[in-house]
Amino acid sequence: MAQAWAFLLLPALALASYASHLLLPAYITTPLCGGGDGARSFFLCAQAPKDQDQDPSPASTMYKTAFHFQPAKNWMNDPSGPMYFNGIYHEFYQYNLNGPIFGDIVWGHSVSTDLVNWIGLEPALVRDTPSDIDGCWTGSVTILPGGKPVIIYTGGNIDQHQTQNIAFPKNRSDPYLREWIKAANNPVLRPDEPGMNVIEFRDPTTGWIGPDGHWRMAVGGELNGYSAALLYKSEDFLNWTKVDHPPYSHNGSNMWECPDFFAALPGNNGGLDLSAAIPQGAKHALKMSVDSVDKYMIGVYDLQRDAFVPDNVVDDRRLWLRMDYGTFYASKSFFDSKKGRRIVWGWSGETDSPSDDLAKGWAGLHTIPRTIWLAADGKQLLQWPVEEIESLRTNEINHQGLELNKGDLFEIKEVDAFQADVEIDFELASIDEAEPFDPSWLLDPEKHCGEAGASVPGGIGPFGLVILASDNMDEHTEVYFRVYKSQEKYMVLMCSDLRRSSLRPGLEKPAYGGFFEFDLAKERKISLRTLIDRSAVESFGGGGRVCITSRVYPAVLANVGRAHIYAFNNGNAMVRVPQLSAWTMRKAQVNVEKGWSAI
């Protein structure tokens, strides 16, 4: 069991006397916690602090995000059917009209012109027919020929069996598409074939057109004990026939929720429209939500056999690729025809307690929408926040030419530490001190982040950011890298360690982490971007190779209203920072109940 580690500030006079010998004129580092030999390190092995005896009011609005998508109140979960249509972005989502806990699910609906500011509308779909009386659950939107959007969604029927249902906009001339009419022949799909699990049949994908001109879509399900994305065909999007075989299945995993299937060209950050012809050289991504995380495979879609063939067949699902290594689930992507890109959202649930959610009156949010594309080598997906989010940046702070030696902290001042966007490049002065990589770490990178935390010095790293830090450092979150040398390549571990993120009791405070390959022999810079939005933190490492979403609830946010951000290095090798930029993020207008009535 790994110990918890703490920052510990030296007294002010000790800091002043020690800082006088530092030879870094461009900035001042804050060295913390020294050994008897005079060497300084900002980490000190310590017992984990006790949780506060008195909870600092979890109902505080301080934990409500300023620029993430969430309703004004109550429970939300999966993104459902995001789309761009006639100049408007639509975000549908699983929503409980009646409270901040799961249940009574309908389709919430919001619209935007910029993916940043959102108008909340009345629910698009409610539970009012026999085929969805138990809930209007996750689904997708497909744009049919002639510019006709159609929703296909999972409904829970009166027997609590899961069915697939269709709805069309009542008035396509309404720019907001406020009202939707359910098809008379709903449900269009039932789990009534032999071997199908009637309560594990949900979350239809966006449709795509095959070489025969017929529509296809996939639905998450269980068939004869196998987890699969079940495949269906239709000529008119109303009458569907199950294809004999799923495009891909696996017998060693739990049911695949929220499947997503899309094409991408290696190295091209433009998206591909599934309703159009797929160009030569394109690959496909098959994503599934399983084991409480979103995983995916890259491969080739065999059009003749309607089969997905992964580039690498991996039986151990712990080694499957991950969309995000943190609190991120049920993601849904769509093709943005306005800018020719693919955008993905994920649901980030709360990691405080249900009683906290009841007190707050809200639970759940969606991650910042991300552009998603296939890396040039065709091996993995890359993600980056959409450029529109940068419109909220203000009060830019820049630093160049920093050098971080072992134990150095550099405070990033003059930005709001609770609402910030930080971009930093780390340049390795040497790669000779990289420690050997153990391939078994790939099975559980979170465990390795916990055992080799930021307080444990390494050869190269840990280096990164300390965010949401209280004055005395008894609360802080660490986002950082470690570099390892494999036989023929370098492996970078990215961690987001929440174990000391809050003194509040009853919280989940894990150490998240994931590995990515990096050609450090050619490129010595590793980038990190972290967006801090009160209780939501999203970090993107190595240009989007690893993404980690974290939910944090520091007491300092509710009690003090002041926190700090630092860049740090605790590795033996010196790390340069050629560029550091940070911004305060303004508050977006997101589903406010009053005060914003038009786009």
UniProtKB/Swiss-Prot annotation:
Listed EC numbers: 3.2.1.153
Keyword S-adenosyl-L-methionine: no
Active site: 78
GO biological process entries: carbohydrate metabolic process
Any one GO MF annotation of this record: fructan beta-(2,1)-fructosidase activity
UniProt KW keywords: Disulfide bond, Glycoprotein, Glycosidase, Hydrolase, Signal
Protein's UniProt keywords contain Acetylation: no
Organism domain of life: Eukaryota
Top EC class of this enzyme: hydrolase
Disulfide bridge positions per record: 449-495
Glycan attachment positions: 171, 239, 251
Catalysed conversion reaction: Hydrolysis of terminal, non-reducing (2->1)-linked beta-D-fructofuranose residues in fructans
Region forming the signal peptide: 1-16
InterPro entries documented for this protein: ConA-like_dom_sf, Fructan_Metab_Enzymes, Glyco_hydro_32, Glyco_hydro_32_C, Glyco_hydro_32_N, Glyco_hydro_beta-prop_sf
Protein task: Hydrolyzes inulin-type beta-(2,1)-fructans. May play a role as a beta-(2,1)-trimmer during graminan biosynthesis.
Record-stated family: Belongs to the glycosyl hydrolase 32 family.
Protein name (Swiss-Prot/TrEMBL): Fructan 1-exohydrolase
Source organism per UniProt: Hordeum vulgare
Encoding gene (name): 1-FEH
